[in-house]
Amino acid sequence: SSILADWDFKGTIDVASELGFSCVELACWPQGKAERRYGGVSHIDTEGLTKERAAEILDCCRQKKVSLSSLAYYPNTMDGDAAKREKAIEHLYSVIEASSMLSVGMVTTFVGRDSQKPVEVNLELFAKIWPPIVKFAKERNVKIAIENCPMLFGIDQWPGGQNLFTSPVLWREMFKIIPDDNFGINFDPSHFVWQQMDYIRPIYEFRDRLFHVHFKDIKLLRDKLAECGVLAYPLAFMLPKIPGLGDVDWGKFVSALTDIGYDGAACIEVEDRSFEGSRDMI
């Protein structure tokens, strides 16, 4: 729901209902100023959530026939800045608690990454930070679904990006570290498109870890790529698009999901700037 930054919770659910959506992945950043684009949106104040407010939220969802697929918070819990890291982790715990209180049972997020350190060091950091988080969630019957976005788009995330959970190679390593059955994937095929990776095969290999899905597209600008190469800032050779306007083969993607019997949420993630000019366009 981050695209609906100017709407409050009720307004967001109203819009979803009017447009015929059956569920919403609800943005739950901390209250206050956003630190990045599509971040900082808070449709529920998880740190101040009471049983009374939770009941109001659930009642609104029931009346509008819109469920919450997940509570979403995508910070960098492995930030090289220790203060930022601890702040992100602290709020993530509140989001997990709120997901349990609201009987949502899902939190979608990033594992994070120290962008100045190599993969090997980040895996060690992951092994220290994430097992307690996943255990905390499991005790509250909450699944943790990690999106496969590298969070590497421009100079702000250079050089390593801000999320380690980027490829099947790394997924296998992280699932060895945390084999818990409530730790899985929020799969967005668009990130594999611009990295020129296979986005169909992982659906079959990781079928038991596939908890949540994003429908977002990417247009790979091959003329730009031919000039700047894969080591350029990614936004130099790709454009995020709404589903159907990029290079994802949605027929093959949905076919693979049906092959494995996926019956979870599929949420449209809008980061297409062509549709951000007004409320009507959004």
Question: Where on the chain are the PLM-derived regions?
Answer:
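Glycine-rich, proline-tolerant flexible connector loops at the mouths of alpha/beta enzymes
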Residues: 25-58, 117
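Glycine-/proline-rich flexible loop or hinge segments
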Residues: 37-44, 72-80
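Active-site acidic/histidine proton-transfer and metal-coordination neighborhood
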Residues: 17, 55-70, 76-184, 194, ...
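Conserved radical SAM core fold
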Residues: 29-34, 77, 114-116, 151-153, ...
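Histidine-acidic metal/acid-base catalytic patches
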Residues: 1-23, 28-30, 56, 62, ...
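A generic secondary-structure micro-motif detector
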Residues: 2, 46-47, 85, 123, ...
